[in-house]
Amino acid sequence: SVIRTMKSIEDSDFEIPGEFRAILRGYQKTGFRWLKTLDACGFGGILADDMGLGKTIQVISLLYDEQKAEEKKPSLIICPASMVYNWESEFERFAPSIKVCMVAGTAPEREAAISHLAECDVAVTSYDLLKRDIALYQKQQFRYQVIDEAQYIKNPMTQGARAVKAIQSECRFALTGTPVENRLSELWSIFDYLMPGFLYTYDKFKKRYESPIVKDQDEEALGRLQRMTAPFILRRLKSDVLKEL
């Protein structure tokens, strides 16, 4: 039934927030509804649109919509250091009413920012700083957790990947233009962050999917994996949405 829900996203009754109706393109409105549908069903997902198709604004529209929730909790965005201030300026541009807290700067500045997260709507930090500050986040509970350039956690054994997975959040999303760059274990690691256990332990995943697909070119195993993960990955290419650009 989840799959059925996912397939009827175009007709879903999630209203696009008024401020975004004129800004979002058609496929971005579908993206907003897709994120809302996954959240409502208790799942996370990978927004894997091509570069330049506005993954950021689709997430901002989701976070803006959360403003009307009765019990508000802050959300957390984790991205490469080079993108931190890009996120800040996109919020200022599209949703200036959202109170954004930048967890950056010196260690004391970051500690002060983290201790005041309850006063913010959204916190933004980098993978590197999250890794250093992870102990300070232990008491924090987030509504949404969004990782940008999710290939940063493609190796599940790194401190960065472990830090991201240690954060407590109600709903998790990942943004990436390349869900799998080189190895299927990268996809496993992103799903291990989104919905731990959904693709089993890594050993079991390797036995069931990775080894048969990579070593034996097993089409049936590949088909099973695609069917299992498809509802949780939304990827549009520029060529798919040319007429809307």
Give the positions of each predicted feature.
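ASCE P-loop NTPase motor core, strongest for the SF2 helicase catalytic module
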Residues: 2-217, 224-245
